[in-house]
């Protein structure tokens, strides 16, 4: 059976007590969420990429995800991203260059968006 890394990351974030009570979704922030409510959004930057080849076969996959935190409180964005970073490290993901760290006047929220790269174990089907 094929595995789904997005679901695995979502579950890891949802299971963390320090993130309880915060809306965590994939792909986009829910329209029904209040403008003043904090959210975390997991966005695949692309499909899994073949890596670690052997005998004309891909033995592992590389993944790239962007995780956005939006809040009316800049410090809360930083604290949440700090916790997310630890969770992602536990999942074998590390932050890459780029991202976003700014106040967006149109939505009246701070946004801290970071990109994480990780790899599956050998012989896992994703």
Model-derived segments and spans:
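Small/polar-rich, solvent-exposed N-terminal microdomains that initiate assembly or binding
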Residues: 1-52
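Oligomerization/assembly interface segments of phage tail-like spikes and tubes
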Residues: 59-72, 109-121
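Acidic-leaning, charged glycine-interspersed low-complexity segments
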Residues: 82-126
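Compositionally biased, intrinsically disordered low-complexity segments enriched in polar/Pro/Gly
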Residues: 1, 33, 59, 122-126
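Charged low-complexity stretches with an acidic bias
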Residues: 69-83
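Amphipathic alpha-helical segments
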Residues: 6-17, 81-93
């Amino acid at each position: 059976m094929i595995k789904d890394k997005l679901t695995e990351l979502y579950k890891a974030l949802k299971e963390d007590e320090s993130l309880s009570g915060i809306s965590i979704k994939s792909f986009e922030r829910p329209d029904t969420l209040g403008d003043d409510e904090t959210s975390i959004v997991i966005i695949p930057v692309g499909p899994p990429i073949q890596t670690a080849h052997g005998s004309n076969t891909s033995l592992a996959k590389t993944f790239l995800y962007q995780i956005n935190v939006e809040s009316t409180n800049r410090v809360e964005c930083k604290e949440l991203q700090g916790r997310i970073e630890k969770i992602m490290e536990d999942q074998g993901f590390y932050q890459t260059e780029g991202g976003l760290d700014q106040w967006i006047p149109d939505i009246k929220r701070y946004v801290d968006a970071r990109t994480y790269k990780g790899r599956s174990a050998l012989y896992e089907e994703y």
